[in-house]
A protein has these predicted regions:
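N-terminal low-complexity, acidic/polar interaction/targeting segments
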Residues: 1-189
Length: 189
């Protein structure tokens, strides 16, 4: 088990995903400083907007880049590395959450079945039209169900709680079929 700082957000990322963040609270500025100094990461857990609580399953992320922004805030770019489950946690005096987590195994690699390839093509078209959704120079795996389901979940305008459900699903193909149902339900709107 690992102890990691937790950054509760009203946003979600998956392993392999990129996310820009603007840091301004002292506890998180200190967290970022320590992560950069120690070459470690932190956890992103989705807030559930009830009692300032957050989900136990989240994504462990590493900081790729940081910069002082024009408005004085710290800008960082993170990349999701692996999912975790919080076993227990403590809240430090500065309100930073430190959690003891179990890193979760990712499902086995699975190619996308032929009947789901149109959803991979859908993702490819989105990323060609809107490259800001994913780093231009990052590798793209349009035939791999885990990568496609993760990127689709990150960019689709789904309810955050529904994205969390996808993050918690252990099987990449089940994730992709769930996303297929979501996309198909929106085609006639």
């Amino acid at each position: 088990m690992n102890n990691i700082p937790i950054f509760p957000l009203s946003s979600i990322t998956f392993p392999g995903g990129y996310m820009p963040l603007r840091i301004f609270e002292r506890r998180y500025l200190d967290m970022v400083k320590n992560c950069v100094k120690d070459n470690t990461g932190f956890g992103i857990s989705l807030t559930n907007n009830i009692d300032n609580e957050y989900y136990d399953i989240g994504t462990y992320c590493k900081i790729l880049d940081w910069e002082q922004m024009d408005d004085g805030l710290l800008g960082i770019t993170i990349r999701g590395k692996s999912r975790y489950k919080i076993v227990n946690k403590v809240v430090k005096d500065d309100k930073l959450i430190i959690a003891n987590v179990e890193m979760m195994d990712e499902p086995n690699f699975a190619d996308i079945p032929k009947e789901l390839m149109p959803y991979s093509d859908f993702l490819k078209n989105i990323l060609e039209q809107y490259p800001k959704f994913y780093h231009d120079d990052a590798p793209k795996y349009f035939t791999e169900s885990g990568w496609v389901s993760s990127r689709l979940t990150e960019i689709l305008p789904m309810e955050l709680k529904d994205k969390q459900v996808i993050l918690e699903i252990e099987d990449y193909l089940v994730r992709l079929y769930r996303l297929k149902d979501y996309i198909d339900s929106k085609k006639n709107i």
